[in-house]
Amino acid sequence: ISIVTETRNFHAIGVRLGRHDATITLFDLSSKVLAEEHYPLPERTQQTLEHALLNAIAQFIDSYQRKLRELIAISVILPGLVDPDSGKIHYMPHIQVENWGLVEALEERFKVTCFVGHDIRSLALAEHYFGASQDCEDSILVRVHRGTGAGIISNGRIFIGRNGNVGEIGHIQVEPLGERCHCGNFGCLETIAANAAIEQRVLNLLKQGYQSRVPLDDCTIKTICKAANKGDSLASEVIEYVGRHLGKTIAIAINLFNPQKIVIAGEITEADKVLLPAIESCINTQALKAFRTNLPVVRSELDHRSAIGAFALVKRAMLNGILLQHLLEN
């Protein structure tokens, strides 16, 4: 029996919960964006954050009531340690949480099926469904942002293991004598390949007198990438330096998982013509030849869509029958 999902009459809300804000997006079941809003969430306790988040979602629903037909799911993605089965959050990098039962709170408030997931792992799944890795079953996505993390897709599914969290690639040690990481160890990849670390490295070099197109008062990842694209030697050298360390770590992951494709995400990919060759150079010298041959390293196609990872969790629930059963019953 062939079943085709009716995409127009059913809607889902995807939420990307960041450290200081939330992006809330209304999707139809084809992944088309119908509406999107950004809400500041400066709260610093679990209780106040939950209250503010649920109110923001309620406000969003009220604002777009005319566009909503039947809301069948709400999905939230966020940084931290998430148990997708229980719907509980055990750790977030910016506030203290303790067994935060977010799914339970969402379902109690909105009376629909709800999901919660890790932001980077969910983005990897979204790339598999809608983006750069649609053409393969095994892929690794690495995202550079405030930190560095990975999402592993194996046989078309998120690889998470019994404990529910894998892919903390940012805490592989790449420089034993390097800077102290917020995790307590020294020389983690994240101390080199994260936006703040990249900006600080360029800023330090500028203060030492090195010449660059990057202005001292606007030393951001955006201006660094723009300068690298224009051939600025300092910006290019820093991006290459980051790329080499990413490449070393990705080579380890390749030797472990033998993926069909590597996807790189984050603002740093704006300098992809400098970054990707540096990554590939390390892969070519440090990954097994049989594993690296014909292995594409590409940019994310969905990095600009904040909440698409949240919708990927809804798509997965459609495919595995959880939401499909709901649709058939209605």
Protein language model features and the residues they cover:
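Short glycine-aspartate micro-motif
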Residues: 2, 12-16, 71-75, 139-143, ...
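Short, acidic, Ser/Thr-enriched surface-loop or helix-capping motifs
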Residues: 28, 84, 153
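ATP-binding/phosphotransfer module of carbohydrate and carboxylate kinases, centering on a glycine-rich
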Residues: 2-70, 177, 189-330
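Solvent-exposed beta-strand sheet faces enriched in polar/charged residues
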Residues: 77, 117, 143, 265, ...
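Glycine/GP-enriched mid-protein hinge/lid loop-to-helix segment characteristic of carbohydrate kinases
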Residues: 36-38, 44-49, 98, 105-226, ...
